[in-house]
Regions:
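Extended, hydrophobic alpha-helical segments in both membrane/secreted and soluble proteins
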Residues: 171, 178-185, 189, 193, ...
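Short glycine-rich phosphate-binding loop at a beta-alpha junction
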Residues: 166-177, 181, 265, 309
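Secondary-structure transition/capping motifs at alpha-helix termini
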Residues: 32-33, 164-169, 187-194, 229-231, ...
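PRPP-dependent phosphoribosyltransferase catalytic core
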Residues: 43, 58-60, 65, 96-98, ...
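Flexible loop/turn segments at secondary-structure boundaries
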Residues: 61, 70-71, 92-94, 117-118, ...
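Conserved short alpha-helical segments that host acidic/polar catalytic motifs at enzyme active sites
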Residues: 1-104, 110-169, 174
C-alpha cells in the first residue's frame, strides 16, 4: 500500500506498516458500514494492492482481494459448515480441508456463524504476479486456477526448447523450487537427471538475504552436494532465478573446485530479473541485479559457468498459460502494472511536497 503513511495521518493511527494501517482503517470503516461495504470503501482510499483476512469484534471473518489479484487468496471448506481462507490451496490439503476456488480479483467474502456472503466491490483488472509461479508459491498449490507444479514442468520444457546443452552427462536441479524445471528439461532432452544436492533440512531463502555473507552461508547451510552424482561430468544445473549472482558463483565454484565437475552449464527457469518489485517481494535495487547489466556471456564469466541462459519472457508467459496482459511481469520487463506506476507517482509527489 503506497499511501499508507497518508492514510495513517488522515485517520490518526500509527504508521508501523501498511498492513497495520490497512487494519486500522478497515476498523474505522466497520464502525459506520456493513463489513462488505467497508471493504469497498477501503479500496477507494488505497493506492496499492492487497489480499487480506480480518476478524471483526463480532467474530466475523472478512476476506478480500484487490482488483488486480496480484497476490493469491483462496477459499475452501472444512466439514459441513466451516469456511477456510488461505493464501495458497496447499494449506487446505495440509489440514484436510476441501479447496473450492480462488477469491476473484475485486471480490470480498464475509463469514458469520450462520452464513457466507460474497460481494464484488470493484471490477476485476487481473494482473497476477508471474513470480509466484516461478519461485514464491509452493508446487502443490493451485493459483488462479492453474497448477504451479504443471507450470514449472512446462518451464523446464521451454528451457529445453530454448537453451538445450548438447552432450550433457547429467541434469541437476537446485532444491527445491527448480526440481520440476530440471525433471522436465531432462525428459525433453533425454539427459539423465541426478540428485546433485541434498537439503540439510534448513529452509532458507538465500537469494533474498540482505548481505552477501548471509547469502553465501545460506547456500552452505541448506545444500550439500553429492560428489558421486556429478564428479568429472558435464552437467546442466538448473535454478529458479538469479538475483545478484553471488550464490550461483559460489555453487559453480564448489562444483568445479571441490567436486571436480568438468563443465557447468547454468539454465535459469525465469527471465532476467532486471527491476525491483514495488509490492514487497525482496528483490534488491536495480544496481545490484546482475541480469540488468551483463550479457549471458558476461554472467557466465563472472559466475565461472561455461554457459549461462535464462528463460525468455515469452516462454514464461506460455508456460503459465495466462494472457500476458493479465500478468505482472514488472521485475522481468521494468514496466510495472498501472497501480504500481500510480503508487510511485504518489510517492514522488509526496516526497516533493515534503521537500518543498
Amino acid at each position: 500500500v503506497f499511501n499508507y503513511r497518508e492514510l495513517a495521518q488522515k485517520y490518526d493511527v500509527p504508521a508501523w506498516s501498511d498492513a497495520q494501517v490497512l487494519a486500522e482503517v478497515l476498523s474505522r470503516k466497520l464502525q459506520q458500514s456493513d463489513p462488505l461495504e467497508a471493504v469497498g470503501e477501503l479500496h477507494e482510499e488505497v493506492v496499492g494492492t492487497f489480499s487480506f483476512v480480518a476478524i471483526t469484534e463480532r467474530g466475523e471473518l472478512i476476506a478480500a482481494r484487490d482488483p488486480t489479484g496480484l497476490k493469491p487468496l483462496v477459499i475452501g471448506s472444512f466439514g459441513f459448515d466451516y469456511g477456510v481462507i488461505a493464501s495458497e490451496s496447499c494449506a487446505m490439503d495440509v489440514i484436510g480441508a476441501d479447496f473450492k476456488h480462488d477469491i476473484e480479483p475485486g471480490e470480498a467474502y464475509l463469514f458469520t456463524p450462520y452464513s457466507i456472503e460474497r460481494k464484488r466491490f470493484a471490477e476485476p483488472n487481473p494482473r497476477y504476479c508471474a513470480f509466484e509461479y516461478v519461485y514464491m508459491a509452493r508446487p502443490d498449490s493451485i493459483i488462479n486456477g492453474i497448477s504451479v507444479y504443471e507450470v514449472r514442468m512446462r518451464i523446464g520444457e521451454k528451457l529445453a526448447e530454448e537453451a538445450a546443452v548438447e552432450g550433457a552427462d547429467v541434469v541437476v536441479g537446485v532444491p527445491e523450487t527448480a526440481i520440476p524445471f530440471a525433471m522436465a528439461y531432462a525428459n525433453r532432452t533425454s539427459t539423465p537427471i541426478h540428485m546433485g544436492f541434498v537439503r540439510t533440512g534448513r529452509r532458507i531463502r538465500s537469494a533474498i538475504k540482505p548481505t552477501q555473507f548471509e547469502r553465501l552461508v545460506g547456500v552452505q547451510l541448506k545444500l550439500n552436494p553429492i560428489r558421486r552424482a556429478v564428479a568429472g561430468k558435464k552437467i546442466v544445473i538448473i535454478d529458479d532465478s538469479v538475483v545478484r549472482g553471488t550464490t550461483t558463483k559460489n555453487t559453480v565454484n564448489m562444483l568445479r573446485n571441490r567436486l571436480g565437475v568438468k563443465e557447468v552449464h547454468v539454465r535459469i527457469g525465469s527471465p532476467r530479473l532486471i527491476a525491483p518489485c514495488p509490492f514487497g517481494v525482496e528483490v534488491p535495487a536495480r544496481d545490484e541485479l546482475i541480469a540488468a547489466h551483463l550479457t549471458d556471456e558476461e554472467v557466465a564469466a563472472v559466475t565461472g559457468a561455461d554457459t549461462f541462459c535464462w528463460l525468455s519472457i515469452e516462454g514464461l508467459v506460455e508456460a503459465i498459460g495466462t494472457p500476458r496482459e493479465h500478468l505482472c511481469l514488472g521485475c522481468f520487463t521494468g514496466q510495472h502494472i498501472e497501480v504500481a506506476q500510480r503508487g510511485m507517482e504518489f510517492l514522488k509527489e509526496l516526497k516533493e511536497a515534503v521537500a518543498g
